[in-house]
Amino acid sequence: MVSLEQLREHETVRTDPVPESQALVDVRQLSLWYGTKQALYDISVRFPKNQVTAIIGPSGCGKSTLLRSLNRMNDLVPGVRVKGEVLYEGVNIYDPRVDPVAVRRHIGMVFQKPNPFPKTIFENVAFGLRLMGVKGSELEDRVVEALKRAALWEEVKDRFKKESGLRLSGGQQQRLCIARAIAVEPPLLLMDEPTSALDPIATQAIEDLILELKERYTVVIVTHNMQQAARVSDRTLFMHLGVLVEEGPTEVIFTKPKHPYTEAYITGRFG
């Protein structure tokens, strides 16, 4: 329908852009290559504090690559090369002096497929806290609080110290992974297709949770489900062929998109 060259001829369409003072993360002219293949093209965007930002677009458009750039998960891919800046609370996380492991302690991530450890529910959530040196009653208090925030506590409170996280249902496992991520109080939580492997009831529980989480955290979610993006997000980014085509308030993107390619995707004419 459209060539990369045509997309790159035009700047990103922005509606109500996020002021620098309200941004937790400020991406500046970010490009990324896997070997010789370029996956992201000169992306600049800000992610506002205590809001949910959804990233949408057809398969292979660079959604997950952009998401994983926000906590340097792409560093784990052989041959990756990055140009540009990702400022997290004003610090460029790609500065050579910055430890990527330290970055990931501040930025939690929840993956497409739940990945609980083969440990008890308690030990799953306690894992990151123990690495931080949290012990004793404080450790238990923070585990319980994280399970409550992840809307899992009432379902597991009678067995969380003895039952393996692997015995939970898929939806419960995903909420356990969210509890594990938020236990260490990361200001930023990244979610890569967090409900794609779940049934509708479990999906609803995760969506309700996302809306609650933004009171304490900044959330960025990648989703193929446009209805989900419309339900849970405050702002939406539309990507195509590694280019950020349009960004703005979710209501604008879904009801009055300004770029013809955004409108074509939203109305189902491609993707």
Swiss-Prot record:
- PROSITE patterns on file: ABC_TRANSPORTER_1 (PS00211), ABC_TRANSPORTER_2 (PS50893), PSTB (PS51238)
Provide the disulphide bond pattern: none
Q: Where in the cell is it found?
A: Cell inner membrane
Q: Does the keyword NAD apply?
A: no
Reactions catalysed:
phosphate(out) + ATP + H2O = ADP + 2 phosphate(in) + H(+)
> Mind telling me which SUPFAM superfamilies this protein's record contains?
P-loop containing nucleoside triphosphate hydrolases
Q: What Gene Ontology terms describe where this protein resides (cellular component)?
A: plasma membrane
Which Pfam families does the UniProt record give? ABC_tran
Question: Where does the source fall among the domains of life?
Answer: Bacteria
Membrane topology is: Peripheral membrane protein
Similarity section: Belongs to the ABC transporter superfamily. Phosphate importer (TC 3.A.1.7) family.
PANTHER family found in the cross-reference section: ABC TRANSPORTER I FAMILY MEMBER 17
Stated role: Part of the ABC transporter complex PstSACB involved in phosphate import. Responsible for energy coupling to the transport system.
Please describe the quaternary structure of this protein.
The complex is composed of two ATP-binding proteins (PstB), two transmembrane proteins (PstC and PstA) and a solute-binding protein (PstS).
In Swiss-Prot or TrEMBL terms, this protein is called Phosphate import ATP-binding protein PstB
Q: State the taxonomy lineage.
A: Bacteria, Thermotogati, Deinococcota, Deinococci, Thermales
Which gene name does the record give? pstB
